[in-house]
Amino acid sequence: MLKTRLKQSRAISRVVRRYACSHPISPNLDKYPVGLKLHGYEVTQTSPIPEFSLTAVSLKHTESGATHLHLDSPNDSNNVFSIAFKTNPPDNTGVPHILEHTTLCGSKKFPVRDPFFKMTNRSLSNFMNAMTGHDYTFYPFATTNSKDFENLMDVYLSSVFEPQLNHTDFLQEGWRIENQNVHDISSKLEFKGVVYNEMKGQYSNSAYYFYIKFLESIYPSLNNSGGDPKKIVDLSYEGLLEFHSKNYHPSNAKTFTYGKLPLEDSLSKISKYYESFEKKVSSVDVKQPIFSTDKSEIFDVTIPGPVDTMNGKETSEQYCTSITWNLGNPLDPNMQYDIFKWKILSSLLFDGHNSPFYQELIESGYGDDFSANTGLDSTTALLSFTVGLNYLTKQKVDNFNEKVMEIINNKIIPELSNEESSSYHGRIDAILHQIEIGFKRHKPDFGFGLLSSIVPSWVNGVDPIDTLQVEKILSHFKEDYKQNGLRIFKELLEKTLCNPHSQKFKFTMEPREDFTKQLVKDENLMIEKRVSELTEDNKKAIYEQNLELAKLQLEDQNTEVLPTLTIDDIPKRGDFYAIDLGQVNKKVVHERVVDTNGLVYANALKDISYLPTKLYKYLPLFNNCLTNLAGTENTPITELETKIQMLTGGITFSSKISTDPYNIEQLKLQYVLSGMALKEKSSSVYDLWLEILTTTKFDTSDEVLEKLSVLIKNMGQNQINNIADRGHSYAAAVSSSKLTPSKYISDIVSGLSQVQFVMELNSKLESEGKEYLAKEIIPILQEIQKYVLQGEFRYRLVGNQEIIVENEKLIEKFDKDISSNRPTLSLTVTDGLSALLNSFNYNHTSENVLVNLPFQVGYSSLGKIGSSYSSKDGASLQILSQLYSFKNLHSKIRESNGAYGGGLTYDGLNGTLNFYSYRDPNPVKSIQTFRDSLSYGLDANWNDKDLQEAKLRVFQSVDAPINISSQGASAFFENIDDYLRQERRENFLGTTLKDLRDVTEKYLVDNQNNLVTVIGDNEILNVDNKWQIRNFQV
């Protein structure tokens, strides 16, 4: 998987995400003294990390020089392992990325094609992956099972240190030339390959394209680790082998363990793999950015880029530009405190309605959205600060530097100089409060989060223990801020952004209407050139080579050589979370009494099925408005935003569909309030819920209309970007919307229908201006507010006993206050959900829909209806989906067809089956594969081992660790209590091969209705008249 950095969000969590977690334990420092020798390693450093309640142990392998970091966390059962390598890409062929894929295609100890994927069926891991960064590659997994941990570590270590790296794996995962029909030598030759198609998909995302080209320009020595599709086809098999030999050596390895399992056992296993390697002197080759190799003060680069055909803007208004300052080298240990200060400052300048760059560049209408590279970034040896915008005219691009400096000099510097009454003081307190909350908040993926935060700098020579010791830097900052106030930030700006001699890099992407077509044309020219150089013998050899590859992809593998867990490793009884049912004002309160480290988690929920269905599509906009419009009657949004961050860990307002676990044709539309806070600030959650829900300003003032205009534009852009990243989910939403009422509503509020609706809002806003908002949208938002205030809430609390008791009193007051603020409204039940349920058509015939969007690769879905959560059939279908995926579809969709991913998923709660492909060069072909596979379960010769593997895969998610705040949540939100969860667990465990054949026949074969959706470019796909083509109108 390519690890990318696209800043789609400017949330405050960006400042604190690497710090967010805590585990209440007291590590033992005496366990691993410095100098202790363990299995060829020597302990070089042992240090407490009190902010995370960990002990960090750093070790060095004496013979090879390999380093290991262990984070001892005796009370966390979710153990993590990783091995990372420094992998500077030598060019733009994507060799680190392709190697990441091919190492996992079989090894000396496990000579099975794709052991990585096959281990997902033999494990209870809750996380398994491999990731390629700018100049590093790492292979992490997490599991709560000690036997599983040992098995997976063995597979990972064998994969990276003794991979087979067969030529056929290179062809499959990297790139190859192949006949369009692999069995027809006369058919057209084309480029294929998993990574090749993945990167074609990435390049379809304009935000990714802008960012990766920016990085290539500002950091030319680093090269593109993911690979440029034009260059991927230049990589040779020999080049792959050479890159592995050079980089995948113990001297270049960083291994990591986290959790409660014995360090000694891990080191013993790792050191055995190191024995076969000769000692090798290794030095860290840190590539330098353009600022280090060219001492110029100003750099200016312009490149051509794609036009976004979905946002309704003229080509001349689609320039993207950014200005970046060089802040120094983040690998310098003396820079760590400056980096922390820059994180705080970056949040002040960019995050939220209070931030000056947001106010002056987005709200003012100068641009629509920040560019993907905006903000503070640490990439290898470059710490940079960037201000960038999307959707500008050429004139605004030319004036952009002047505009940014005007904001800095006329707004930011004066505010930083206003020590006595600056609004920045409150915002800084809010940021520090979020960090404090982060230390206390429990997250089940804590270990992996720490790993992700240290790897990029660790492979470049930074001590990871220093990176983890946040408390020292935080204490330093608090003291510095107490003594010097805002001056510390003013001085940062004066030394860098305001310094006329600071190195500055301007990067612009100029829109070209023919850009996407040119990419396709270039690909065709590349393949034509390659083909023109082939002799008939060459073509025959390619044909035979690919026939052999296709044959290999279909061959059964001897998976007996792989380690595995068994059904006996799955606990027969699942976790039960004791829930007390309290009562406040005759309203039920679900109470989960558990240690939450001083935090309270609160929810309020009500049934709003009476809401007229015509208002459903406006719910996401309404929810967004509550915390992003102009604020409330008493609190402007700038103050409200700071108040939320200073007093709580966050509050949200959302709507959700809850399907009856016993009947997929019955559901409720619910409205949910959520909040989290420190115990001593609990009352703030309820005060803010009340104020926001009852007094948010939905009037036609200029301020409200301006905010609403910006919000709608931002929603549109975010949704468009999401399609390229999650196209298979959107395709599935379209297919499933014809199957059940819950999926129909889901498409309206979060699927392609919602995207289309927001695009229509933007189109009308563009043509009619803010008068349209005042006349059409504001009255609807006011109407929804009235509806949401109808009905009664019920409540949920998670915390210790003292917190629960205190919050019951707070809920009692909130409930009385919210009830007294209920407006008079006549509810017409016939307009609501019941009318939709009564009229829903369950008898859709098969149909094929192409959603015509300009993507180089496509996404496909074939949907069918299933059964309820509580039914035995539902459990069998969940297991069936795993067998279809790993025994049939994976090889056909990914390995043969070259899509990045594909399979069959089952939504157990909503009862829908979905065949899918992701980043697929031929999604229409995948649809035919799905059709051909419908009866596969009747003919497959599955055995008990196959059934066991499918059950293991299902239980990876069933038994995955969850947040403390989620314990018992399904009983409150979905009416699924522990006993029903246990019943479904027993249905999983009791599923037989006969059950699988029965549900195959009943739901896949006998049900002939296939709801098909493909998202892609019809100029490439050229579908026939059997397809309905759905064009997005703007």
Curated annotation (Swiss-Prot):
- Gene3D superfamilies given in the database record: Metalloenzyme, LuxS/M16 peptidase-like
Cell location: Mitochondrion intermembrane space; Mitochondrion matrix
- Any one GO molecular-function label of the UniProt entry: metalloendopeptidase activity
| Active site residues per record | 100 (proton acceptor), 173
The UniProt entry, under InterPro entries, shows: Metalloenz_LuxS/M16, Pept_M16_N, Peptidase_M16_C, Peptidase_M16C_assoc, PreP_C
EC number(s) of the enzyme? 3.4.24.-
Q: What is its main location?
A: mitochondrion
Q: What class of enzyme is it?
A: hydrolase
Where in the sequence is the transit peptide found? 1-26
Under the subunit heading, UniProt states: Monomer and homodimer; homodimerization is induced by binding of the substrate.
User: What is the similarity comment for this entry?
Assistant: Belongs to the peptidase M16 family. PreP subfamily.
Entry function: Degrades mitochondrial transit peptides after their cleavage in the intermembrane space or in the matrix, and presequence peptides; clearance of these peptides is required to keep the presequence processing machinery running. Preferentially cleaves the N-terminal side of paired basic amino acid residues. Also degrades other unstructured peptides. May function as an ATP-dependent peptidase as opposed to a metalloendopeptidase.
Stated name of the protein = Presequence protease, mitochondrial
Species in which this protein is naturally found: Candida albicans (strain SC5314 / ATCC MYA-2876) (Yeast)
Kindly list the organism's lineage. Eukaryota, Fungi, Dikarya, Ascomycota, Saccharomycotina
